[in-house]
A protein has these predicted regions:
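E1/E1-like adenylate-forming module used to activate ubiquitin-like modifiers
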Residues: 78, 83-174
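Glycine-rich phosphate-binding loop and adjoining beta1-alpha1-beta2 segment
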Residues: 15-51
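N-terminal Rossmann-like FAD-binding beta1-loop-alpha1 element of flavoenzymes
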Residues: 1-2
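Conserved S-adenosyl-L-methionine
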Residues: 5-10
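Conserved small/polar residues in nucleotide/adenosyl-binding loops
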Residues: 176-178
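Conserved SAM/SAH-binding loop
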Residues: 60-67
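Hydrophobic/aromatic anchor residues within beta-strands of the central parallel beta-sheet
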Residues: 56-58
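Short amphipathic alpha-helix with an adjacent loop that forms part of the alpha/beta core around
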Residues: 67-74
Length: 178
């Protein structure tokens, strides 16, 4: 949404996920009305409400090494990564680098509550982030020596209980009247 409000006129949205009730506390597109809808469709509609002239292409697929061939990043001006899996992130970074397309990757934000602890830096300057550590190790093996990332310097908090719910594995939509 921020990109559309900033005047970016062409966006490709790639995600096979649907809005889940558990997304409402942290994702701007997630509302009670959008639960169950594809995130890319909800985002595209909102972007078109902001800028009716925007060109928005949606892809209901997860970006993985197996689906990467569907995308030619040589025609992209910039890539913003928010993939949840290490394998998807690595494939995206490697393909962006091969296409010489600038990329910024999001690192782990789970169990973090201090918005002032986020910063944009190079992957190799990050600390305390388990995802960044894995990405550093994997990308170093592949010869990637520089990558712009956003990450939090905050140590993750320990959840109060183990009630983490994922709509992929335990959909609670049928249990709740919306």
């Amino acid at each position: 949404e921020a990109l559309a409000r900033s005047g970016v006129g062409s966006l490709d949205l790639i995600d096979d996920d649907k809005v889940c009730l558990t997304n409402i506390n942290r994702q701007i597109y997630a509302t009670r009305k959008t639960v169950g809808q594809y995130k890319v469709d909800v985002a595209a509609e909102r972007i078109k409400d902001i800028n009716p002239d925007a060109v928005v292409r949606t892809y209901k697929t997860f970006y993985t090494p197996e689906t990467a061939d569907q995308f030619d990043f040589k025609h992209y001006d910039y890539i913003v990564d928010a993939i949840d899996t290490v394998t998807g992130k690595i494939a995206l970074v490697m393909n962006a680098k091969a296409a010489k397309t600038p990329i910024i990757c999001s690192m782990g934000a789970g169990n973090k509550v201090d918005p002032t602890a986020f910063e944009v830096t190079d992957l190799y300057k990050t600390s305390v982030c388990p995802l960044a550590k894995v990405m550093r190790n994997e990308l170093k093996k592949r010869g990637v020596r520089k990558l712009k990332v956003v990450y939090s310097k905050e140590l993750p908090i320990t959840p109060v209980d183990d009630m983490a719910i994922s709509c992929r594995t335990h959909c609670i939509l049928s249990l709740i009247h919306i």
